[in-house]
Amino acid sequence: MVERICPKCKIPMNTSKCVKASCQEKTVMSTTLYWCSHCNVPIFESVCPKCGSESKYIATDIRPVFPEERLLLALIQEKENPYCYDSASVWYGGGAYIINGKKEKISVTEINKWSLEKIKSIKEAYDSLAEGIDQSYFEENIALFVEANTDRYNYITEEAMRFVLTYKDKFEIRDMMVSFSGGKDSTVTSHIVNTALGTNQVLHVFGDTTLEFPTTLEYKKRFNKNEESKGVRILTAKNREKNFE
């Protein structure tokens, strides 16, 4: 939900200033996320679109914590069972990990004080345990998150497509371009542009800074082989003045 929030108190409210007498900070427009305890996922509405349960405010920005990071988190916290988060709904937002709807903060300052021996032992433990990670609950939880937020996804997709279409009568297809970095954001942008305009003839420009990961370059190759993006023209603009390799 897009609503006003106090940037200091991190609480959503419908006033131009914070309702707390001790604060009175000017509120700002923000995307507010809630937590549905029944579905155990974050949602964009105060009432869960899937189950109808009342939800509670959780953060203004959030990201999923993948199974590999969950294992590392458990090792850092010295949990008795390093796989304890395999069957939990774990996210990160507001400077804290959100585990089944409850926030847990990790002090990076304290971790930076750890000895190299301790960090090395955690790395060794992670390497030996990584193959035992169970991804099944994570996949189910993400699928539930997508289902619960389908209306929101559809809304922002349609909004983005309407925005792209406002330029259809202003520019020729040959004058348009997509800045393509090989990441998730530019992939979504490419999909929205091609779908909205009904063509894959919009030029994509890939900026090769020489700092790209090998996986990024590999994805660029695979991108052109996907059924949806097959035939998309990708022009590579390489940095030839400074080589960071």
Please annotate each region the language model reported.
Residues 2-38, 42-46, 52-55, 67-74, ...:
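ATP-dependent adenylation/nucleotidyltransferase module used to activate substrates
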Residues 58:
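Short, Gly/Pro- and small/polar-rich lid/capping loops
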